[in-house]
Amino acid sequence: MFNVIANGIPGTEMPGHWFTDREIRQLVAFVRTLGRVAPQKATGDVVNGEKLYAGKGGCASCHTIGGRGGAIGPDLSDIGASRSLSYLRESLTSPEAAVPDGFLEVQLVTRKGRRMTGVRLNEDTFSIQIRDLSGDFRSFFKSELAELNKQPGKSPMPSYTKVFTQSELDDLVAYLDSLRGLE
């Protein structure tokens, strides 16, 4: 980030700036605080939450932590640094309440009758690329599709209210809150 501020981005309209090195370091430190939330005291058991994440919840089949896990859902490596305890709990109990940007669910049917649900990765006028619920990358020409239904506000993630007890939800929230990436 330091170099981008100091030198700009070649080939774009972002020029370098005349700030001193000290001012740039201060600016970088400030920008890194944006979007972060102050640590709150989670009431659950972090160790048990990690076990629930890896086991009973099956969370790692869709989410990534530290480069390991699935790719259907958001990377959770630093989720505790950017989301509050209430947001984390709501994402587990009502995942459709706040679907993260970049995770638009789509349902499609090919002209041959094949149905598929996934998360849109890219789309242009002629094609769409998705990651299906198995985690596989799929690409389609739109001319091959009989139906393409975008599902804004819908999430492939289920609600965990009937999967976990309240105590287990507390543990999982505590674990997610402990994930703060590289600090």
Language-model features: where?
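Extracytoplasmic electron-transfer domains, predominantly the class I c-type cytochrome c fold
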Residues: 1-35, 61, 70-72, 78-177
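Accessory carbohydrate-binding/adhesion or oligomerization-edge regions at the termini
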Residues: 34-42
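Sequence/structural segment immediately N-terminal to covalent heme-attachment motifs in c-type
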Residues: 1, 41-67, 80
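Short acidic/polar inter-strand loop motif in beta-rich domains
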Residues: 180-182
